[in-house]
Amino acid sequence: MMPSRTNLATGIPSSKVKYSRLSSTDDGYIDLQFKKTPPKIPYKAIALATVLFLIGAFLIIIGSLLLSGYISKGGADRAVPVLIIGILVFLPGFYHLRIAYYASKGYRGYSYDDIPDFDD
């Protein structure tokens, strides 16, 4: 007969608990702990990166046209700030779109976790 366990808090023996032996082939692991959950795709952050990329590209094109003289509304004194703002807006958009693209293709070292999310 198996000995009954004692509840330490009250000192009352508990005989209603049923015990069963584990299988000798069980190594203590379950399959679920090795399954990888699908990545959460940050759609809002990717949309924002796309908007930054497009606005930055547009400003770079406009700044280049202003600087070269195809658009004659002020010359170089207006072209340089437009180019600088275009580059500053373009770079983060390009960077995060590149990470999103490589993560979607499954390249090693890239994941959606590298893109900042809005915690919704």
Swiss-Prot record:
State where the protein is found: Membrane; Golgi apparatus, trans-Golgi network; Cytoplasmic vesicle, Secretory vesicle, Synaptic vesicle; Early endosome
Q: Does the keyword Transmembrane apply?
A: yes
Keyword check for DNA damage? no
**What, per the annotation, is the impact of changing Y29C?**
In PARK; uncertain significance; sporadic case; results in decreased synaptic vesicle trafficking
Sorted alphabetically, which keywords does the UniProt record give?
Cytoplasmic vesicle, Disease variant, Endosome, Golgi apparatus, Membrane, Neurodegeneration, Parkinson disease, Parkinsonism, Phosphoprotein, Synapse, Transmembrane, Transmembrane helix
Cleavable signal peptide? none
The condition associated with this protein in its record is: Parkinson disease: A complex neurodegenerative disorder characterized by bradykinesia, resting tremor, muscular rigidity and postural instability. Additional features are characteristic postural abnormalities, dysautonomia, dystonic cramps, and dementia. The pathology of Parkinson disease involves the loss of dopaminergic neurons in the substantia nigra and the presence of Lewy bodies (intraneuronal accumulations of aggregated proteins), in surviving neurons in various areas of the brain.
By what name is this protein known?
A: Transmembrane protein 230
Which species expresses this protein natively? Homo sapiens (Human)
* Name of the gene: TMEM230
